[in-house]
């Protein structure tokens, strides 16, 4: 048999990518590079795969993360060797916490070119450490190893990911040459061992893991007599709606994190929990049932800790499909690893009757007071602030999706917004400010639904070049950047006053008009709330593509207004 290493490299990649496609991969994110040629060309040649490109591997990883969030399917990423691989670490760390399925296909130099001074060669094996669920270090393509081995090895890694989510790393060392005009037919005899697989459509091998929760560790009789609270963390709309039905059946209060995409009569809890009257009522709770994870509100997390610390494990229940620990304060807890919708259905909602239904009804009036005060603040004046943007969000979303950034904005949304039946996306695993724009781009590419993104100025600066991902976007989208000239979140934290500006907030003095122009995006900088509302609505009703709306506010304004509002609220609830 004649040998052509470039062709053999592509034969291996053709087999690998076809198996990924059969396993549910539809999207492949590709960065430029020569060493990744076998993967890139075979991905392009596979009609089952849709390719997305970006010149920045760090942004590419977050683009894949957004695609995986929105599609709920595994997404592959192809990069060349060297630091290109290292740039995938931030998105990989996030997926390790939030369980989106990424498949990292990293091209590498062959082993004899590592640790010997060869160009663009770093130690890539194990580079993602514990942030990936599994790592498969492939040998360089050779006819001495069968394609049957390649398929079963890939399938084994995919089976682990299918069960627990997260990322898997497949490192692919390709010897040169990387380019050839010869046909794969020259390796027909070598590929004959998988001819049956090639002529079919199924995966080569499959692994099915049994459901470990055959009987639920908690029965309705254990909670029907309780004064319970239901907490909704990061969920999709279907899960959140089902969990709300459970709380309604029992007559229990439900606290909806903005990541759940729904609201309840007990909205704005982060604010009214400052009231002693409200806390006295809430502290009657003797049972907490949490669906999902990663609650934004620090006050709610503190209340869970103080309340559940005296509970036994059967009084604090967390239901989540995530097998990883969801217990940041190490409380007595029962974690039920289950599909949320299925678990709620198994509780037989029509037969449930809570013995203390309505026990938290007085808190509804308190929540309504907060909402009325918040709405009054924006209706009595036309001032455009971070707080007014958060309050207005409830009206602005309509049937649009939301991507909310980290730091100050997600906290203001948690406090002041009332999101109802909207799909909400965020990066609240590691809660970094890097890659937010790229992640939102992935969401838009996957869903192609109108979307509003709320992001801070420092976060946008961090991921500015990912605006290139929206240059050719036609789906109506508005990126709202609140520009307070630095990290305003530090106005809410007890950082040293003397070093607050220089070491924490780091004022930059930039605006984003020219950034929008560089990436061919629409741009507006409204000066009033009414102007902001009009601009956003006009874009969604008449336009297409991406509009960058810059809301310029003075430094420290958000913290000052929030403190004033909290003082007014405490007085009103006294």
From Swiss-Prot:
Q: SUPFAM superfamilies from the entry? A: DHS-like NAD/FAD-binding domain (SSF52467), Thiamin diphosphate-binding fold (THDP-binding) (SSF52518)
Needed co-factor(s): Mg(2+); Mn(2+); thiamine diphosphate
CDD domains, A to Z: TPP_PYR_MenD, TPP_SHCHC_synthase
One record GO biological process: menaquinone biosynthetic process
Return the EC number. 2.2.1.9
- Quote the PANTHER family the UniProt record gives: 2-SUCCINYL-5-ENOLPYRUVYL-6-HYDROXY-3-CYCLOHEXENE-1-CARBOXYLATE SYNTHASE, PROTEIN PHYLLO, CHLOROPLASTIC
Q: What's the protein here called?
A: 2-succinyl-5-enolpyruvyl-6-hydroxy-3-cyclohexene-1-carboxylate synthase
């Amino acid at each position: 048999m004649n040998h052509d290493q470039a062709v053999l490299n592509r034969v291996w990649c053709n087999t690998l990518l076809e198996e990924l496609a059969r396993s549910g991969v539809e999207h492949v994110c590709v960065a430029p590079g020569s060493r990744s040629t076998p993967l890139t060309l075979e991905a392009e040649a596979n009609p089952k795969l849709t390719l997305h490109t970006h010149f920045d591997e760090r942004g590419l990883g977050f683009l894949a993360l957004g695609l995986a969030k929105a599609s709920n399917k595994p997404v592959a990423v192809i990069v060349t060797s060297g630091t290109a691989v290292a740039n995938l670490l931030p998105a990989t760390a996030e997926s390790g916490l939030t369980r989106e399925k990424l498949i990292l296909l990293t091209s590498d130099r062959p082993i004899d070119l590592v640790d010997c001074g060869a160009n663009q060669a770093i130690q890539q094996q194990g580079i993602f450490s514990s942030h990936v669920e599994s790592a498969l270090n492939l040998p360089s393509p050779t006819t001495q190893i069968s394609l049957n081995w390649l398929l079963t090895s890939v399938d084994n890694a995919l089976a682990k990911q299918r069960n627990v989510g997260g990322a898997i790393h497949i490192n692919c060392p390709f010897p040169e040459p990387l380019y050839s005009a010869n046909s794969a037919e020259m390796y027909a005899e070598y590929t004959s061992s998988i001819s049956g697989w090639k002529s079919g459509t199924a995966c080569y091998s499959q692994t099915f893991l049994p459901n470990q929760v055959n009987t639920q560790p908690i029965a309705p009789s254990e909670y029907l007599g309780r004064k319970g609270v239901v907490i909704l963390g990061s969920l999709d709309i279907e899960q959140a709606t089902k969990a709300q039905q459970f709380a309604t059946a029992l007559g229990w209060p439900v606290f909806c994190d903005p990541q759940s995409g729904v609201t309840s009569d007990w909205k704005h809890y982060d604010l009214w929990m400052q009231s002693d009257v409200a806390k006295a009522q809430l502290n009657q709770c003797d049972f907490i049932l949490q669906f999902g994870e990663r609650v934004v509100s620090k006050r709610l997390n503190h209340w869970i800790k103080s309340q559940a610390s005296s509970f036994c494990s059967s009084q604090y229940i967390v239901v989540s499909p995530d097998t990883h620990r969801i217990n940041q304060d190490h409380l007595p807890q029962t974690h039920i690893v289950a599909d949320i919708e299925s678990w709620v259905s198994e509780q037989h909602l029509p037969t449930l009757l809570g013995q203390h239904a309505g026990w938290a009804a007085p808190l509804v009036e308190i929540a309504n007071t907060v909402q009325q005060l918040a709405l009054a603040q924006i209706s009595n004046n036309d001032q455009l602030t971070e707080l007014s943007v958060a309050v207005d969000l409830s009206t602005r979303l309509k049937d649009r999706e939301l991507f909310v950034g980290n730091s100050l904005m997600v906290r203001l949304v948690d406090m002041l917004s009332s999101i109802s039946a909207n799909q909400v996306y965020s990066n609240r695993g590691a809660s970094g400010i890097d890659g937010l724009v790229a992640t939102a781009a992935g969401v838009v590419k996957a869903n192609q639904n109108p979307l509003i993104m709320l992001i801070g100025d420092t976060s946008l600066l961090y991921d500015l070049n990912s605006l290139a991902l929206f240059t050719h976007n036609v789906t109506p989208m508005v990126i709202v950047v609140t520009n307070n000239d630095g990290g305003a979140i530090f106005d809410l934290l007890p950082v040293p006053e003397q070093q607050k500006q220089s070491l924490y907030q780091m004022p930059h003095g930039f605006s984003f008009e020219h950034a929008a122009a560089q990436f061919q995006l629409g741009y507006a900088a409204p000066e009033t709330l009414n102007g902001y509302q009009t601009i956003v609505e006009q874009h969604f009703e008449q336009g297409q593509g991406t509009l960058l709306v810059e809301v310029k506010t003075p430094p420290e304004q958000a913290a000052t207004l929030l403190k004033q509002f909290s003082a007014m609220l405490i007085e009103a609830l006294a």
